[in-house]
């Protein structure tokens, strides 16, 4: 008998130890018997499920797990699609009773100091909010009665003081509790009144922005606070220029080192933010972050990281603020007669050439034939390449386009007209790069080039400072990011990329702005 009792005692102790190592949250939600309740955590604006339980006929159930839940703000999600928040800290064995009629009023907590102080503070705020609303209505009714207005304002002020005192007491009494740290994280930094200059106030605010919000405190990622806090800093407090943003992003990412969860979130968040951003400067940030940190992304596959590295290597060649790669092209003649003289040679190309396939054993020989035929063709455009870098101009607009593109058909005539009327008057030259089809299919290339000829002739796209360019061997597809047509790049006189992937009208506005800034600088 003693042995049996001993075994039962040991079993009970081991069960208790197992429970202490994991979580056991007993719930009773009135009015939803035999229904499902979800336990989950906040992750910025998302609700992430962690566990489910089906309540019994008494509306009771237990969430159990062998591993402890990470500290943070959690929720209980009900079949009505309503939910109420709870906190998970180090002590994860407790009970919660509630009623669907009023979550805050009917909440009962047993065994969790964290949730009790959370609930008490919520009640205080709720009561203060109701009082404040009543006083606001009374203040409106008391307009014109100065004594009454002042009396009401004092009462409103006392409410704020009461809430502030509750916060200070909470922080002093439970300094190491998650809820105290969460409350502190919700509070904005206060700029000392002694700092009166607005610029100084801004820089103080920025320098101390994260004082109440430690970026390396992992539980904050399981709240609604983390991402909005970072977004506000990046969007509102940082200079929106590539070099500044790169520096700020590095600071944010490095602040999270030492915690894999935070490091992964911060890197992924900033990487995706600038990968999707349509601002032409955003790509500089995306490329820099990917180049530095991609190899550290232990959670990504090698194939994914390899693909990212290839994209980064390509985009490095065409970043705004960086020198562009040169374009070595052949120029289409500037009159219809000489263009028509080229048509027999593209007909000959079609007759001589045949489609080639890499799988065929004679691929290399046929590829050599392709090169010979294309060399013969482009030599009839002229025997020397035109270097875009070597053409002197204050501004150089490079547009990649093709005659089958419906948007190109609309934009290219407009661009040519705008060039003749406006762009050429401010020292801008245009390099219209024809994007040919695959050189492995001469039939398709023949058809496509004829369309190019037809379009240029019909629109009479001939003018001094306007260059119609072509070169099937040029590596522009590797050196310029052209995922759609037409795509515009704007270079300065030193061939540095100053804008890309915006309309030619926007580029014109930028050129005007730069010219005006230059004139102002001269006048100083």
Model-found features: residue ranges?
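Bacterial Sec-dependent N-terminal signal peptides
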Residues: 1-28, 434, 500, 517-524
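A non-transmembrane, solvent-exposed segment enriched in polar/low-complexity residues
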Residues: 21-175, 182-212
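Coil residues (strongly favoring Ser/Thr
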Residues: 36, 51-52, 100, 244, ...
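Thiol/disulfide oxidoreductase modules built on the thioredoxin-like
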Residues: 186, 471-515
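A recognition module on extended beta-rich or small alphabeta surfaces enriched in W/G with H and D/E
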Residues: 198-244
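N-terminal targeting signals for export/organelle localization
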Residues: 243-371, 523-524
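Short active-site neighborhood of thiol/selenol oxidoreductases, capturing the structured segment around
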Residues: 344-352, 357-365, 371-416, 429-433
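Structural microenvironment flanking redox-active thiols in thiol-disulfide oxidoreductases
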Residues: 409-458, 473-477
């Amino acid at each position: 008998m003693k042995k049996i009792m001993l075994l039962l005692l040991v079993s009970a102790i081991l069960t208790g130890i197992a429970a202490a190592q994991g979580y056991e949250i007993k719930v009773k939600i009135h009015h939803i018997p035999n229904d499902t309740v979800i336990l989950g955590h906040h992750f910025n604006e998302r609700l992430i499920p962690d566990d489910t339980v089906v309540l019994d006929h008494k509306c009771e159930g237990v969430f159990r797990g062998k591993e402890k839940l990470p500290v943070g703000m959690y929720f209980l999600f009900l079949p009505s699609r309503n939910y109420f928040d709870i906190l998970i800290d180090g002590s994860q064995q407790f009970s919660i009773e509630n009623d669907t009629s009023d979550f805050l009023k009917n909440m009962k907590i047993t065994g969790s100091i964290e949730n009790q102080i959370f609930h008490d503070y919520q009640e205080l705020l709720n009561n203060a909010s109701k009082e404040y609303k009543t006083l606001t209505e009374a203040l409106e009714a008391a307009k014109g009665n100065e004594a009454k207005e002042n009396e009401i304002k004092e009462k409103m002020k006392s409410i704020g003081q009461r809430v502030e005192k509750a916060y200070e007491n909470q922080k002093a009494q439970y300094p190491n509790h998650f809820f105290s740290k969460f409350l502190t994280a919700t509070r904005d930094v206060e700029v000392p009144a002694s700092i009166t200059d607005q610029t100084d106030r801004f820089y103080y605010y920025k320098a101390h922005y994260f004082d109440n919000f430690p970026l390396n405190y992992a539980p904050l990622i399981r709240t609604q606070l983390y991402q909005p806090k970072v977004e506000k800093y990046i969007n509102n407090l940082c200079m929106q220029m590539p070099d500044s943003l790169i520096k700020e992003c590095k600071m944010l990412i490095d602040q999270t080192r030492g915690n894999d969860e935070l490091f992964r979130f911060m890197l992924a968040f900033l990487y995706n933010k600038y990968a999707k951003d349509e601002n032409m400067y955003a790509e500089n940030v995306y490329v820099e972050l990917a180049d530095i940190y991609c190899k550290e992304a232990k959670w990504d596959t090698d194939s994914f990281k390899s693909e990212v590295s290839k994209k980064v290597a390509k985009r490095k060649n065409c970043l705004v603020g960086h020198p562009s790669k040169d374009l070595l092209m052949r120029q289409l003649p500037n009159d219809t007669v000489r263009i028509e003289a080229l048509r027999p040679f593209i007909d000959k190309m079609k007759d001589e050439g045949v489609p080639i396939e890499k799988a065929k054993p004679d691929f290399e020989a046929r590829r050599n034939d392709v090169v010979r035929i294309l060399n013969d063709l482009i030599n009839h455009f002229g025997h020397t390449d035109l270097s875009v870098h070597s053409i002197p101009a204050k501004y150089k607009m490079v547009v990649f386009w093709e005659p089958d593109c419906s948007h190109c058909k609309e934009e290219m005539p407009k661009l040519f007209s705008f060039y003749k009327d406006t762009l050429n008057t401010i020292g801008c030259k245009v390099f219209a790069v024809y994007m040919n089809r695959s050189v492995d299919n001469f039939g398709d290339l023949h058809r496509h080039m004829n369309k190019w000829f037809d379009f240029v002739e019909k629109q009479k796209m001939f003018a001094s400072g306007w260059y119609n360019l072509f070169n099937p061997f040029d590596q522009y597809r590797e050196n310029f990011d052209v995922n759609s047509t037409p795509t515009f790049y704007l270079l300065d006189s030193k061939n540095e990329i100053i804008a890309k992937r915006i309309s030619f009208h926007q580029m014109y506005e930028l050129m005007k702005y730069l010219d005006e800034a230059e004139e102002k600088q001269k006048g100083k």
